[in-house]
């Protein structure tokens, strides 16, 4: 799985850390909407 930071687009604040096999998978698992949030990272987590 990869680790992503959840960034709120309105103020570019990092608000959460989520995990997923891809960016799309991480969005599904997190429940955040891509319209309002961005995921950055993609680091491999142990």
Residue map of PLM features:
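A short, exposed loop/beta-hairpin motif centered on an aromatic-Gly-Thr core
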Residues: 12-22, 41
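General helical secondary-structure elements
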Residues: 4, 24-25
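Short, mixed-charge low-complexity intrinsically disordered segments
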Residues: 31-46
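Short aromatic-glycine-(Arg/Gly/Cys) micro-motifs in beta-strand/loop hairpins
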Residues: 1-13
């Amino acid at each position: 799985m990869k680790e992503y930071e959840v960034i709120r687009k309105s103020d570019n604040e990092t608000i959460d850390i989520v995990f997923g096999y891809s960016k799309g998978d991480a969005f599904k698992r997190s429940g955040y909407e891509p319209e309002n949030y961005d995921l950055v990272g993609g680091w491999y987590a142990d």
